[in-house]
Amino acid sequence: MAIMSDKWIKEAVINQSMIRPFAEKQVRVHNKEKIISYGLSSYGYDARVSNEFKIFTNINSTTVDPKNFSEYNLVDREVDVCIIPPNSFALGRTIEYFKIPRDVLVICVGKSTYARCGIIVNVTPLEPEWEGHVTLEFSNTTPLPAKIYANEGACQFLFLKSDQICDTSYADRQGKYMKQVGVTLPLT
């Protein structure tokens, strides 16, 4: 597998609609204000987080169970700045909709701007032929409240192209998160 360059990413966007909407260059300023960057980079794509968040809460005294997940574990917010409580967690989603080619696996890494503040972004790999908005997991590892800025960069996606086509893609096996929109909760 090889990591793919900005040139390849642009071609995949043009020919296969791999990322929509797509920023062809790094965007660092919006309305004359500095922002956390997003857009195409040398060997990846920095995606933005939307203003749709689900923040973990303890007010309902529920238990987090991945096999039987309760929406009562979360509070919904549509905000420009999401404040994650100390040592807590929030879910968001990308503004961008991804459509992954059959011979590509995508991994996600966090942005150093957030990591240096104790905010970790986690995303599982985007498998061949998966498509949808990516649900982002934000963990505030600090003892202080932390801010996540909607409509700004949140993470970077790296595209790994295989020299072989997989026998079974995510679409072939009808994966449960296929074509997800919005923040998607755990499914079993």
UniProtKB/Swiss-Prot annotation:
Might you give the EC number(s) for this enzyme? 3.5.4.13
Pathway in which this enzyme or protein is active: Pyrimidine metabolism; dUMP biosynthesis; dUMP from dCTP (dUTP route): step 1/2
Protein keywords: Hydrolase, Nucleotide metabolism, Nucleotide-binding
Residues of the active site? E137 (proton donor/acceptor)
Q: Does the keyword Glycoprotein apply?
A: no
Name the reaction it catalyses. dCTP + H2O + H(+) = dUTP + NH4(+)
According to the UniProt entry, where is the signal peptide? none
InterPro entries in UniProt: dCTP_deaminase (IPR011962), dUTPase-like_sf (IPR036157), dUTPase_trimeric (IPR033704)
Binding positions (dCTP) = K111, S112, T113, Y114, A115, R116, T135, L136, E137, Q156, Y170, K179, Q180
The protein's GO terms of the molecular function aspect are: dCTP deaminase activity; nucleotide binding
* Catalytic EC class: hydrolase
Superkingdom of the source species: Bacteria
Query: What biological-process terms (Gene Ontology) are attached?
Result: dUMP biosynthetic process; dUTP biosynthetic process
List, alphabetically, the Pfam families matched: DCD (PF22769)
What does the sequence similarity comment in the record state about its family? Belongs to the dCTP deaminase family.
Subunit annotation: Homotrimer.
Q: Briefly, what is this protein's role?
A: Catalyzes the deamination of dCTP to dUTP.
Give the matching HAMAP family.
dCTP_deaminase
| Protein name (record) | dCTP deaminase
The gene it comes from is: dcd
